[in-house]
């Protein structure tokens, strides 16, 4: 998604503002959609990294912020005492600001956008493979955003295929505009495969994992710098810079992280011998030699 007609236009300020206009609305409805679908079985995350990783920014860290929570001028969109409805309205107003900055034509009389700048559109598609129904964590999120955008004259078409191959074929052909999918992460938070420009889909020798087509020299250098050290504090600081760059491009809205669940019989297993404080990277199977049966 970009404003302009060349491939290089994907990185312009106007193109970033276009994407942030959508991202701001997707971000504000995440808690509502997640609570409806997962409840306590998943938590909303604010950065494009596993929240269980040692490199994940934490609320107590300097510079930590809620995803897409500032307006086009860099001011906070929300206050702590806002109700949900006030937050939704504030996000919509911030979204309007981003679209205006992207070059969209705003009609004060109707309070809607009436025309898109060259290279952008009044209607965009998001692929959310919910098997033709609503059984997908992001389906309700997309619907909330669709309804919000409709108020300001922009159309979001939810492509809800029954065949999930539709999304993968679109990604392979580079025909997608927005899409919803889950991803898994390895123990080491190295970002080379997903975010380095050498792995943009179609590039020679590419892993094909950079579906955002994000080409940023500073990001590339930071990713490589982080690979030169085993110092976790150093790498965490570098990855925070990377995550902020990714957010500034407006190419991904982090949504949720599922909770791991295990069911055991206390009649059969001595639960005191089960691994305490399991994580996605270290669970009961890693300490199975310590487990005892009753």
Name every feature range the model reports, one short phrase each.
Residues 1-12, 52-90, 108-121, 169-174, ...:
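Short, solvent-exposed loop/beta-turn-alpha elements that line the ligand-binding surface or hinge
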Residues 11-147, 241, 289-292:
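Append "and occasionally in soluble cytosolic enzymes with long acidic Gly/Pro-rich linkers
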Residues 25, 35, 50, 129, ...:
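Active-site-proximal beta-strand/loop segments in catalytic clefts of secreted hydrolases
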Residues 25-39, 102-103, 152-156, 183, ...:
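A generic secondary-structure signal for well-formed alpha-helical elements
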Residues 30-32, 40-41, 132-137, 165-168, ...:
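Flexible loop/turn segments at secondary-structure boundaries
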Residues 126, 147-202:
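Periplasmic binding protein-like
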Residues 223-227, 232-247:
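Short amphipathic alpha-helical coiled-coil/interface segments
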